[in-house]
Amino acid sequence: MRKIYLIMALACMALVSCKPDGVDGKHHGHEYVDLGLSVKWAISNLGASCPEDYGHYFAWGETTTKEIYDEESCPTYGLSYSKLQSEGYIGDKGNLTEEFDAATANWGGDWRMPTDKELDELRTKCTWTWTTNNDVYGYNVVGPNGNSIFLPAAGSRSWSSLMFDGSLGNYWSSTPYMLSNDNAYGFYFNSGSCYMGSYDRNSGRTIRPVLE
């Protein structure tokens, strides 16, 4: 009997550790927070069960995870901007179409990946504090209205390896980098800074979905 109680207690602790604060709503089974920005932000990464979970890693323009993240297995790697358009990867606004947007493909409804401008808005209009959430390093990001989300430092995947988890965060946008056939926009952070950049499309990075 004591063993049963212990199991139940541990299960309750696990549920509490994954319970987010300040949730504003739910769409297609996934909760979001209104930070007072142009879009609403999911409380967790794509593929994660709670805010501090890393979630899944995606190459840019792919909607499923995989074992190896390299140039050969990434269909968008090496494609010019015009080629991305002609093959249907990006639409008229220059961002990934629904078919190739990992957030839309996996969560459905109106969920999608953030654009480069929306990521930069999150970066520049919010207050970022390096912290831990249930022993997971990352940033507490507070919006103009006082609401917040947690972004774990989930690292990234190259080939079969997970690198720099716990110290770096790497998040994709849906926007390709026009000056390179190999890169797309995302943002990167460590314990001291956060900035926008362009990164190899074949690398496995995390995604924080958004809603209009």
Where are these regions (language model features)?
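C-terminal motif of bacterial Sec signal peptides marking the signal peptidase cleavage site
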Residues: 14-17
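Conserved positions within compact, well-structured domain cores
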Residues: 21-212
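Positively charged n-region of N-terminal signal peptides that target proteins for export
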Residues: 1-4, 19-20
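Sec-dependent signal peptide hydrophobic core
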Residues: 5-10
